[in-house]
Swiss-Prot record:
PROSITE patterns: COA_CT_CTER (PS50989). It is an enzyme of class 2 (transferase). This is Acetyl-coenzyme A carboxylase carboxyl transferase subunit alpha. GO terms for molecular function: acetyl-CoA carboxylase activity; ATP binding; carboxyl- or carbamoyltransferase activity. The gene is accA. It catalyses: N(6)-carboxybiotinyl-L-lysyl-[protein] + acetyl-CoA = N(6)-biotinyl-L-lysyl-[protein] + malonyl-CoA. It comes from Saccharophagus degradans (strain 2-40 / ATCC 43961 / DSM 17024). Pathway: Lipid metabolism; malonyl-CoA biosynthesis; malonyl-CoA from acetyl-CoA: step 1/1. Acetyl-CoA carboxylase is a heterohexamer composed of biotin carboxyl carrier protein (AccB), biotin carboxylase (AccC) and two subunits each of ACCase subunit alpha (AccA) and ACCase subunit beta (AccD). One of its GO terms (biological process) is malonyl-CoA biosynthetic process. Pfam families: ACCA.
C-alpha cells in the first residue's frame, strides 16, 4: 500500500522516498545496497517513533481522520467469522452510514454495529461520509434490541464526523433517534462494548457509544464538537482549530485520565493504517478478553454497574 503522509510526517516521507529510489536503483543493476537500505529503514523507524511520541492533540485529530485509516468494514472482515449483514430500520430505509449484523468473534455470537465513512469518492457519497441519518440510528437500535432478545453481546465501532445535520435528517427526527438510542442502550439487558476507532464526534458518536466498556484506539479522538467547529464559535475562525483541540481534551490519554475512557488500545507505530492486520488482531484480543469478563457478570449487576458508570461522568472534573 502506498502511504499518504500528513504534513507533519514530511521527514518520514522524505526518508521513505529515498528508500524507494534505492530499491529501484538496486533492482536495475548488480549493486548491493542492502546495508544502506537497512540504515535508512532504521532511520525512518526512529524518525517515526520520535514524531509519534510527541504528537499534539491537533496532529492526533489528523491521524484519526487519515484517509487510509481502517474503517469499521476493515475490522469486521478481519475480526469476525460467519458475518451476516442486516439492513433497514423497518420505518424508512437502510442508512449505508451504519453497517450492522451478526457474526462470531472467537466462536462467540455477537451483534456488531459500526459507522462507515467510505474509502473512494463514490463510496463516500454512498456512505454519506459516515454521517448517519435517523434511519441509521434506528437501524442500530433495531439490531441492539434483537441482540437483547437473542442474548448476544453488542459491539459497536465508532467513527463519524457527526450525525447528518441536513433538513431531511431533522424532519425525520435525528435528535429523537439519538436520544432514544441513549435511553435504550443505558438499560439494554446484554453486555455492550463500544470502541472509538477513528473520529468520535458529538451525538453521532454517542448514539452508539453507551455501554459497559468504552475503548479508544491510541490515535482516535472523541469530542462534543469538531475542533474546527469549536474554533469557529469561540474565535470566529477555523485557524484556531489546533488551539481548540488542545483545550477540549480530545485524545484518548486525556479522556482516560478523566475516567471517561476505560481502555486505550495501542496502535502500530505510525498509526493503525500502517498495519491494519496487526491493529485488527490487537483489537480482537482486547474485545475477546473484555467479553469474557462482562459475560461472567450477572445481568442485574451489569446494569447497575453501567448506571453507576454513566452517573459518575464528570465527577473527576468537579
Amino acid at each position: 500500500m502506498n502511504l499518504n503522509y500528513l504534513d507533519f510526517e514530511q521527514p518520514i516521507a522524505d526518508l521513505e522516498g529515498k528508500i524507494e529510489e534505492l530499491q529501484l536503483v538496486g533492482s536495475g543493476n548488480a549493486l548491493n545496497l542492502s546495508d544502506e537500505l537497512e540504515r535508512l529503514r532504521q532511520k525512518s523507524a526512529k524518525q517515526t517513533e520520535s514524531i509519534y511520541s510527541n504528537l499534539t492533540p491537533w496532529q492526533i485529530v489528523q491521524v484519526a481522520r487519515h484517509p487510509q485509516r481502517p474503517y469499521s468494514s476493515d475490522y469486521i472482515s478481519r475480526m469476525f467469522e460467519d458475518w451476516d449483514e442486516l439492513h433497514g430500520d423497518r420505518h424508512f430505509g437502510d442508512d449505508k452510514a451504519i453497517i450492522g449484523g451478526v457474526g462470531r468473534i472467537d466462536g462467540k455470537p455477537v451483534m456488531v454495529i459500526g459507522e462507515e465513512k467510505g474509502r473512494s469518492v463514490k463510496d463516500k457519497v454512498y456512505r454519506n461520509f459516515g454521517m448517519p441519518k435517523p434511519e441509521g440510528y434506528r437501524k442500530a437500535l433495531r439490531l441492539m434490541e434483537m441482540a437483547e432478545r437473542f442474548k448476544m453481546p453488542v459491539l459497536t465501532l465508532i467513527d463519524t464526523p457527526g450525525a447528518y445535520p441536513g433538513i431531511d435528517s431533522e424532519e425525520r427526527g435525528i435528535s429523537e433517534s439519538i436520544a432514544q438510542n441513549l435511553a435504550v442502550m443505558s438499560r439494554l439487558r446484554t453486555p455492550i462494548i463500544c470502541t472509538v476507532i477513528g473520529e468520535g464526534s458529538s451525538g453521532g458518536a454517542l448514539a452508539i457509544g453507551v455501554g459497559d466498556q468504552l475503548n479508544m484506539l491510541q490515535y482516535s479522538t472523541y469530542f462534543v464538537i469538531s475542533p474546527e467547529g469549536c474554533a469557529n464559535i469561540i474565535w470566529k475562525t477555523v485557524e484556531k482549530a489546533p488551539l481548540a483541540a488542545e483545550a477540549m481534551g480530545v485524545t484518548s490519554s486525556v479522556l482516560a485520565d478523566l475516567g471517561i475512557v476505560d481502555e486505550t488500545i495501542p496502535e502500530p507505530l505510525g498509526g493503525a493504517h500502517r498495519d491494519i492486520d496487526a491493529m485488527a488482531l490487537k483489537l480482537k484480543e482486547r474485545l475477546v478478553s473484555q467479553l469474557d469478563r462482562l459475560q461472567a457478570v450477572p445481568i442485574e449487576e451489569l446494569l447497575d454497574t453501567r448506571y453507576q458508570r454513566l452517573m459518575s461522568y464528570g465527577n473527576s472534573a468537579v
